[in-house]
């Protein structure tokens, strides 16, 4: 079996029983289970959810996305070996640690396979909860243009690139395009302030004003848990994006939970500590791949300018990236995952068939 066969690229064509269209995102696909299968699994597996809670199978792929495009490699290597397994393993580790520390639960109920989660349907909070400990990336680019206020927070003069900020900053943005909210532009991924969210509690899908405090608390505490754990491996947790939502437990009590993924190389910037002390930035996240793309193509503006999306999509479609680049990404993701979980990562030899076999034999979900 060659390298390309070990990569799960297409993850929305599995024969999982569902009565709804499969939702296929950039990296994950979601299969909503039938009410009958959801109820059966809740009863048989003892999940702490209402008996009629909708469940889904969430399958992560090994695809690599950046700048809103999915990128492919040479020689049929259309994904990054081990990437999906690494992302899930990292999130699983942090979600477990959050629960042990008494923070909050996640949407994950079961992990049948390294690439698969069984999740409870959540009502998402409509913000990307972003926390920043260092000034870098888009924030630094805006700072160099004279901006000093970010999401209603004023930061001091005289900061330098990649410098640690005086305190952890919460700089949320909209999740999707929100309409009819005064003062909030109707566009995807727009920065919003705490006061914007307070004015539109319902519009951002919060159940109460006090839950705004709770999400900020869970964001800060989750950031600190991950930052402290990574510091033990001399890795710096630079910034990250969390997502939150609401679910009900078996007793019908609503609770705010972590959802999607947390503390991964896809959703965070992670730097090597020793290199940073020497004044160099070694990325241990997808940011390294983003920088490679910006340096690789002659006209980097295509990747940064949202008015050139058609050109950007064509660029990603027409250019096969060197296999060595895909393997460098693999080494980064697998390497940071093994540091986080403290053991060697098991990479599937035939991921698609393994998933089908386990969902058939242990969960009776294959048609």
From Swiss-Prot:
Cellular component GO terms, alphabetical: cytoplasm
Keyword ATP-binding tagged: yes
Single GO term (MF): phosphoribosylaminoimidazolesuccinocarboxamide synthase activity
Entry keywords, A to Z: ATP-binding, Ligase, Nucleotide-binding, Purine biosynthesis
Pathway: Purine metabolism; IMP biosynthesis via de novo pathway; 5-amino-1-(5-phospho-D-ribosyl)imidazole-4-carboxamide from 5-amino-1-(5-phospho-D-ribosyl)imidazole-4-carboxylate: step 1/2
UniProt superkingdom: Bacteria
Pfam families named among the record's database cross-references: SAICAR_synt (PF01259)
Coiled coil regions, renumbered to chain: none
Protein name: Phosphoribosylaminoimidazole-succinocarboxamide synthase
Lineage: Bacteria, Pseudomonadati, Pseudomonadota, Gammaproteobacteria, Alteromonadales
């Amino acid at each position: 079996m060659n390298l390309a066969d070990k990569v799960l690229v297409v993850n929305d064509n599995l024969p999982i029983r569902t009565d709804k269209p499969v939702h296929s995102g950039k990296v994950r696909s979601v299969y909503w289970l039938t009410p009958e299968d959801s109820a059966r699994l809740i009863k048989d597996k003892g999940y702490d959810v209402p008996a009629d809670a909708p469940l889904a199978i969430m399958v992560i792929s090994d695809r690599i996305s950046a700048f809103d495009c999915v990128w492919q490699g040479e020689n049929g290597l259309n994904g990054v070996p081990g990437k999906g397994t690494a992302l899930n393993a990292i999130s699983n580790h942090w979600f477990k640690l959050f629960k042990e520390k008494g923070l909050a639960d996640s949407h994950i109920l079961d992990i049948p396979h390294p690439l698969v989660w069984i999740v409870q349907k959540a009502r998402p909070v409509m913000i990307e909860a972003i926390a920043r400990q260092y000034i870098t990336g888009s924030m630094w680019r805006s700072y160099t243009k004279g901006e000093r206020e970010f999401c209603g927070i004023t930061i001091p003069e005289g900061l330098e690139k990649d410098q640690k900020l005086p305190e952890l900053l919460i700089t949320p943005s909209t999740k999707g395009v929100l309409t009819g909210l005064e003062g909030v532009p109707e566009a995807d991924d727009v920065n919003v302030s705490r006061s914007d969210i307070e004015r539109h509690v319902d519009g951002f899908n919060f159940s109460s004003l006090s839950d705004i405090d709770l999400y900020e608390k869970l964001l800060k505490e989750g950031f600190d848990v991950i930052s402290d754990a990574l510091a033990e491996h001399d890795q710096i947790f630079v910034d990250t994006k969390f997502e939150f939502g609401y679910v009900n437990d078996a007793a019908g009590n609503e609770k705010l939970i972590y959802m999607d993924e947390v503390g991964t190389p896809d959703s965070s910037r992670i730097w090597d500590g020793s290199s940073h002390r020497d004044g160099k930035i070694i990325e241990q996240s997808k940011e390294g791949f983003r920088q490679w793309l910006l340096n690789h193509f002659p006209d980097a503006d295509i990747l940064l300018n949202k008015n050139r999306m058609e050109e950007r999509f064509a660029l990603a479609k027409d250019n096969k990236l060197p296999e060595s680049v895909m393997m460098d990404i693999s080494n980064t993701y697998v390497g940071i995952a093994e540091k986080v979980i403290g053991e060697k990562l098991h990479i599937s030899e035939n991921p698609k068939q393994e998933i089908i076999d386990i969902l058939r034999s242990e969960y009776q979900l294959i048609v």
